[in-house]
C-alpha cells in the first residue's frame, strides 16, 4: 500500500512538472502517430479489396469507389499530418524563444543590480582620484631625481656665481697699506702652509655652495 502511494505521489510530482506546452506538443505527436497508422491501414485495406473483388464488375466498381474515397482521405490525412508537424515545430520554437527571453530578462536584471552598485559618477570620481595620485607621484619622482626647468637651472647658476663672488671677496681682503714685517720660513714649511690654506678654503667653498642649493630646493 505504501509502495502504491509512493508511486502515485511520484506520478503527481512528475505531472506537476509537465507544462501546458509539453502536454500540447504530446497531444499533437499522438495525433500525428495515429494519422500515420491510419494511412498504412487504408492502403492495406484498399489493396486487399481490389484484389479479392476484381472478378466481379459491380463489386470491383464499388471497390474502386471505396479506394478513391480512401485515397481522398489519405490526401487529407497527409495535409493534416503536415499541419500537425508544422504546429509542433512552431510550438517547440516558441518555447525555445520563451526560454531565451527569460534568460535575457534575468541577465538584464542582474546587470541593473551591478550598475546600481557601480554608478557612473563613482567611476568618474575614481578615475579622477587615480589621475591625481599618478600626477602627484610623478611630481615627487621628478623632485627626487633633481629635474629642473631651464629657467630654474639658470637661476641656480646665477645664484652660484653670486655666492662664488661673495666668497672670493671674503677670501681675498684688501691689502693693508702698511708694510708687514717679512718673516722668513723654510721653503718646505711655506709650501706646506700654502697647501693647507688652499685645502681649507676649497672645503669651505664647497660646503657653502651645497648649503645654498639645499636651501633653494626646500
Curated annotation (Swiss-Prot):
* Organism of derivation: Dictyostelium discoideum
Q: What's in the GO CC field?
A: ESCRT III complex; multivesicular body
In which compartments does the protein localize? Endosome membrane
What does the UniProt function comment say about this protein? Answer: Probable core component of the endosomal sorting required for transport complex III (ESCRT-III) which is involved in multivesicular bodies (MVBs) formation and sorting of endosomal cargo proteins into MVBs. MVBs contain intraluminal vesicles (ILVs) that are generated by invagination and scission from the limiting membrane of the endosome and are delivered to lysosomes enabling degradation of membrane proteins.
All disulfide bonds of the chain are none
Task: Return the protein name.
Answer: Charged multivesicular body protein 6
Q: Does the keyword Coiled coil apply?
A: yes
Membrane topology classification: Peripheral membrane protein
Q: Which GO terms describe its biological process?
A: late endosome to vacuole transport via multivesicular body sorting pathway; protein transport; vesicle budding from membrane
From which residue to which does any coiled coil extend?
15-42, 70-172
**Entry keyword Coiled coil:** yes
Q: How does it assemble?
A: Probable core component of the endosomal sorting required for transport complex III (ESCRT-III).
Family as reported in the entry's similarity comment = Belongs to the SNF7 family.
Q: Which UniProt keywords apply?
A: Coiled coil, Endosome, Membrane, Protein transport, Transport
